[in-house]
């Protein structure tokens, strides 16, 4: 496999802990149980217009899988899985085949990764919680507007509220990618990745771990 080839795997965020590095300094890490995944389909430039592998992850009761999905997994010769995603690549013909397992051993020489997950949903939140506004005065003439937004624009000019003005609204539950996180350790025996810092999502949430796009993946 090419050293610069994008590598990716699905996993579950287990939570955060702290470990010690070679200089005996405390390092906060997020533990991700990654894989094992299985390759269920290969996309090629000739047939699909782009190169990618489709990987599946997670156990699921076969009775909860519809017929098209069951047929897709059966064609690949694998048992049904809960999650399916595609990882774009430059060339997959020589590196992967349908039915092949994808494990954390793939990241043995990787130093930095990008992690994608779904952030915690907070529901409908006010401007102070959602955007960190300071709020208004607690007394001295303030009438029930302590946590309100305040001014949202002028009257005659422009005579409207600009699009994108920060207000109250639905907070969280967004797809977020955190880039260039240091991959602290790969535990192949337990299928664990120890990633320095925090990654998006709640404990038990699905995450996608890929080699860092903005360089430094193998530095």
From Swiss-Prot:
Note the SUPFAM superfamilies from the entry. Translation proteins
Keyword Ribonucleoprotein in record: yes
A single Gene Ontology CC term:
cytosolic large ribosomal subunit
Q: Name one GO biological process term.
A: translation
Instruction: Supply the InterPro entries for this chain.
Output: Ribosomal_uL3, Ribosomal_uL3_bac/org-type, Ribosomal_uL3_CS, Transl_B-barrel_sf
Keyword line: Ribonucleoprotein, Ribosomal protein, RNA-binding, rRNA-binding
Q: What Gene3D superfamilies does UniProt report for this protein, alphabetically?
A: 3.30.160.810, Translation factors
Q: Which GO terms describe its molecular function?
A: rRNA binding; structural constituent of ribosome
| Family stated for the protein in its record | Belongs to the universal ribosomal protein uL3 family.
The UniProt function text for this chain reads: One of the primary rRNA binding proteins, it binds directly near the 3'-end of the 23S rRNA, where it nucleates assembly of the 50S subunit.
State how it assembles: Part of the 50S ribosomal subunit. Forms a cluster with proteins L14 and L19.
Protein name as catalogued? Large ribosomal subunit protein uL3
- Please name the source species: Corynebacterium kroppenstedtii (strain DSM 44385 / JCM 11950 / CIP 105744 / CCUG 35717)
Provide the taxonomic classification. Bacteria, Bacillati, Actinomycetota, Actinomycetes, Mycobacteriales
């Amino acid at each position: 496999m090419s050293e610069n080839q994008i590598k990716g795997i699905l996993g579950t965020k287990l939570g955060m802990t702290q470990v010690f590095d070679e200089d005996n300094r405390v390092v906060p890490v997020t533990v991700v149980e990654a894989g094992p995944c299985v390759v269920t389909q290969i996309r090629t430039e000739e047939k699909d217009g782009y190169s990618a592998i489709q990987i599946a992850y997670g156990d699921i009761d076969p009775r909860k899988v519809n017929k098209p999905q069951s047929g897709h997994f059966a064609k690949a010769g694998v048992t049904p899985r809960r999650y399916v995603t595609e990882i774009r690549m430059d060339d997959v013909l020589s590196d992967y085949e349908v039915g092949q397992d994808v494990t954390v051993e793939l990241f043995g020489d990787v130093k930095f990764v990008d992690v994608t997950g779904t952030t915690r949903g907070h529901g409908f939140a006010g401007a102070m919680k959602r955007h960190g506004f300071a709020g208004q005065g607690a007394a001295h003439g303030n009438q029930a507007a302590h946590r309100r937004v305040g001014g949202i624009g002028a009257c005659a000019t422009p005579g409207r509220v600009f699009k994108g003005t920060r207000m109250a609204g639905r907070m969280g539950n967004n797809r977020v990618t955190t880039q260039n996180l240091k991959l602290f350790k790969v535990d192949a025996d337990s299928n664990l990745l120890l990633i320095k810092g925090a990654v998006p999502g709640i404990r038990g949430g699905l995450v996608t771990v890929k080699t860092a796009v903005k360089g430094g993946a193998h530095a």
